[in-house]
Amino acid sequence: MKILIAANWKMNKNRLEAKDMIEKLMSMPEGIPPQRDIVLFPPFLAIDTIKEKLKNSTIVIGAQNFYPAPSGAFTGEISLEMLKDVGCSWVLIGHSERRHIIGELPTLIEQKTKLALSYGFSIILCIGETAQEREAGLVNSVLEQQLRTSLTDIPSKAISQLVIAYEPVWAIGTGKVASQQDIITAHTLIRKILHNMIGNTSQNIRILYGGSVNSENASSILELDNVNGLLVGGASLQAESFMKIIHAGFSE
């Protein structure tokens, strides 16, 4: 399977800054290698601008959030229909900042997962433990609970739309990176849980690592067992560092 590199810009970059960054990325001589799938998750207001700049590119656009209803009295929210209208084909679900800062509950994450898959969106479902849960020895149970809560009873035809991102909460934006053994252990566990839930087709689900990924550590992380890509935060905000990450892990 192809390595997937996903860029989560979070609440960064206005439209002009987003346009400038994409123009710089697309003009770099390295180019986007065919060995990589690339998804960008910009702020909502930059989606249209970026989509226009990427119309001749293999890079695709996703949204960082949406509300699981087709329309209605949900002040401040965005629907999947609206995202389709601006050309989004991916959505990010369950990111630790939405779980722990915004306060999204497992039931909402489950609703979002199932609705997005039913609409034909590809999704990156984020899971991961807090520092307190890790210290209490709860990593395995937390990851299994998050997966089972979100993915129980999803139709087999939707498996190809699903990507999992392991993001230990204590490593998000902190500069701390999980050790290689921690990553291998978590990704191997995730792969086992997915197999128990879904069966052999789960082998087609890509598992990404996210957590203070940068151009210096990307290659070594991609070499690890059961790591099929990266979810990149701050290091995706600059064209130079993001291009290095895109090219990490192989020689042309």
UniProtKB/Swiss-Prot annotation:
Annotated GO molecular function terms are:
triose-phosphate isomerase activity
Which reaction does this chain catalyze?
D-glyceraldehyde 3-phosphate = dihydroxyacetone phosphate
Q: What is its main location?
A: cytoplasm
Where in or outside the cell? Cytoplasm
Asked if Cytoplasm is a keyword of the record, the answer is yes
Its annotated pathway reads:
Carbohydrate biosynthesis; gluconeogenesis; Carbohydrate degradation; glycolysis; D-glyceraldehyde 3-phosphate from glycerone phosphate: step 1/1
The record describes the protein's role as: Involved in the gluconeogenesis. Catalyzes stereospecifically the conversion of dihydroxyacetone phosphate (DHAP) to D-glyceraldehyde-3-phosphate (G3P).
Q: Where is the active site?
A: 95 (electrophile), 167 (proton acceptor)
Listed name of the protein: Triosephosphate isomerase
Q: Which CDD domains does the UniProt entry name for this protein? A: TIM
Pfam families attached to this UniProt entry: TIM (PF00121)
GO biological-process terms attached to the record: gluconeogenesis; glyceraldehyde-3-phosphate biosynthetic process; glycerol catabolic process; glycolytic process
Concerning its family, UniProt says: Belongs to the triosephosphate isomerase family.
Q: What is the originating organism of this protein? A: Lawsonia intracellularis (strain PHE/MN1-00)
Known partners and oligomeric status = Homodimer.
Which of UniProt's keywords are assigned here? Cytoplasm, Gluconeogenesis, Glycolysis, Isomerase
GO CC field: cytosol
Xref: PROSITE patterns: TIM_1, TIM_2
The residues the record assigns to binding substrate are 8-10, 173, 212, 233-234
